[in-house]
Amino acid sequence: MRIRILSSYTGPAFATALPTIPVYIYLPTLYGVHLDLGLTITGIVLLIARLIDTLTDPLIGLLSDKFAFRNNHRKPWIIAGALIAGIGIHQLLNPNPDAGIVYLLSWSITLYVGWTMFAVPYLAWGAELSSDYHERTRITSYRECISILGILAAGALIAGATFMGWSEPKSI
């Protein structure tokens, strides 16, 4: 596989890995401590959103396989999912001071549905790029390495922002 195609496919893995640290590590603190929901309630709300996510994963997989678009049949799902997830993460990381349980739950579900709409077709697309087993392994390995670089970059950005004196909520 040409490096240009491999780079085009693996590039989004970097961008989609960037929000993982803010969402998984700082989101509970943001809502549980800074917005006074309490860590237990915040954890329960996020668990409920994840349980709903377990239902949407196979549904989105089925729909993205069944309703294929002509050329690049997975790209509309990927683009729509990225937009929905982007809106969800923006709302989650920029809550109103009076944001409560319903706000956290609804925007968490929005994020996870968007993420599923992005991730399931994106991962399936990688498997469709080659019929050769070893080439698919190479494609997946490159994608996951780029994803890890995105996670490390997110951690470095937040650490750098904190080092420069920004508070934790401003860092995320």
Where on the chain are the PLM-derived regions?
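Membrane-embedded alpha-helical bundles of multi-pass transporters/translocases
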Residues: M1-I172
